[in-house]
Each structure stands twice: as C-alpha cells, then as structure tokens.
Amino acid sequence: MGCTGGWVAKVITDIAGSSAWFERGFVTYSNEAKAQMIGVREETLAQHGAVSEPVVVEMAIGALKAARADYAVSISGIAGPDGGSEEKPVGTVWFAFATARGEGITRRECFSGDRDAVRRQATAYALQTLWQQFLQNT
C-alpha cells in the first residue's frame, strides 16, 4: 500500500475481533518492496511510475496471491508535501480493488489538504469503496 503507510490495516485492526477475518496487509512503500513482496513487475514501475493504474492493479493481484485472500485493496499516491507534478499533483491517489473471484475495479482520486489529510481521506475512501462495491451485499 502506497501513501497510507498501512493505515487501512490499522483501521481494520482497530475493530475488536478483526483477527477472525483479517490476516495481513502489505506496506510496500518503495518500488523494491512492491516488486519483492507482491510481484509488481519492474517494467510496469519503470514505464508508468508507482502512482499509476497499472501498478495498483498489479499490487492488488499480487496481494491476493501472496495472502491467498478473498479481497485486496491497493493504494499508491502522492500525499505530499513534495513529489507532485503537473500530471500527478500532490493529493493524487490510485486505488485498485480485486477479489479472488476475478472481479476488480480501479479508481483515481485527487484529495486536498496536507499530508495527513490526504492519507486519512485515502484510507476512508478505500474502506468505503471496498464496503460499497464488494461487501455490503454479501
């Protein structure tokens, strides 16, 4: 997970009893970690950059495989205050959501505020989208 530094797993494990259904999360802050831990191809990282749709898709698929999970959420973004560009300004965050059944969606959002605000908004967005798109009607 990119710009949140594991906050999604933190919020999930704040719930009493979450150990019954949450096994693990991956904090893959560096490109090397993305490649080593969840199999993101170096070519994908080089061609598109870490904050991109192809990378978060590979992250989600890799997390599903590595964890043998039912659901995976991947996040990669630019929380700031530095690191933004005209094409990818600070606050840009890519998300991928994947299931073991082969379903998946991607989303790109641009959040405002300081680094902490971007990270909090990204975490909330990831959990809300996972719930609304995949878990609410199961």
Where are these regions (language model features)?
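Short alpha-helical segments enriched in small residues
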Residues: 2-138
